[in-house]
UniProtKB/Swiss-Prot annotation:
Keywords: Activator, DNA-binding, Transcription, Transcription regulation
Entries under Gene3D superfamilies matching the protein: Periplasmic binding protein-like II, Winged helix-like DNA-binding domain superfamily/Winged helix DNA-binding domain
CDD domains: PBP2_GcdR_TrpI_HvrB_AmpR_like
HTH lysR-type domain: residues covered: 15-72
DNA-binding region: 32-51
The protein's role, per its UniProt record: Regulates the expression of the dsdX-dsdA operon.
Protein name (Swiss-Prot/TrEMBL): HTH-type transcriptional regulator DsdC
Induction data: By growth in D-serine.
The family this protein is said to belong to: Belongs to the LysR transcriptional regulatory family.
Amino acid sequence: MEPLREIRNRLLNGWQLSKMHTFEVAARHQSFALAAEELSLSPSAVSHRINQLEEELGIQLFVRSHRKVELTHEGKRVYWALKSSLDTLNQEILDIKNQELSGTLTLYSRPSIAQCWLVPALGDFTRRYPSISLTVLTGNDNVNLQRAGIDLAIYFDDAPSAQLTHHFLMDEEILPVCSPEYAQRHALTNTVINLCHCTLLHDRQAWSNDSGTDEWHSWAQHYAVNLPTSSGIGFDRSDLAVIAAMNHIGVAMGRKRLVQKRLASGELVAPFGDMTVKCHQHYYITTLPGRQWPKIEAFIIWLREQVKTTS
C-alpha cells in the first residue's frame, strides 16, 4: 500500500489547478492541437502540461495515438467532475453579480405586447435603473428561457408552464375597433347590423391554442351577432391587425390594453361603444425557478406600476 504521504502529494494543489485548465480545454476538444490554438500555446507545450499533470496525479488521463487523443475512463471521470465544478462556480459568480441592480437583463415578449404597451414605457425604467442594460426579444413561441438566455418573459395565455415561476400581470378585454373613416363608410356607429358586410381582421395566434378566429368567434357568440367569423384577413400579430384597421382595411378585434392610446388619440374608434368581452387569457410574467434576483424583482415591480398607470 502506498504511504499516506505519497497519496496526499497527488491531491490537487495550486500548481496543478493551472494545469487542470489545460486539461479541460484538451478534453473538451479531444485534441492537443485545438487546445493549443485556444490557449495560445504550442501543441508540445500542451502535451508537456498534460504529461506533468498525469505524473503528479498518478492517473493516465489520455490515450495517445498517432493522429488523435482520447480520454481514458479515469480521464472522463476527472473531466466531468471538473466541468461540473466549473459550472457550479460560474453559476455562483453569476448569482453574486446578479444580486446587484446592474448588468444585463434580457426580456422576451409577444410582439404586440412589446410594441403597443411595453416598449413605449421603457424610458421610465432606464431612467430609474441606468446601470441595467436591457435587451428586448419578441416572438410568438414559448421559448426555453434557460437555453435562450432569457431572464424574464411576458406572455398572453391561459396556461403558464408548471416548470416556471409565474406572476399575474394584468387581465384583458377585447372589442371591435376600426378607423373613423371605415366606421362612417360602413355605417357602423352604434349598430352591428352592417358588421356582417365588413372585412374582419384576425390575430391568428392570439394565444397558444387559438384556432385562428377565436377572438371574433367569442365576441360574436357573447353578443349573439351572426358573423362569418371564418372569413377576412389573418395576421400572426394583434398589432398588425390593428394597423390594418387604422388603414381602413377592416374591423379588428382589439385588445383594450393595447389599443387604448389609439382610441384616445382618435386614430381608432370603437364603433359599438363598450361592447367588450373579458378574456379567459391574461398577461403573465415567467422566470426560471430560483431567479429572485434584485434586477428581475425590480423589473416585475416596475411592470406592475405600469399596469396601474395605464388602467
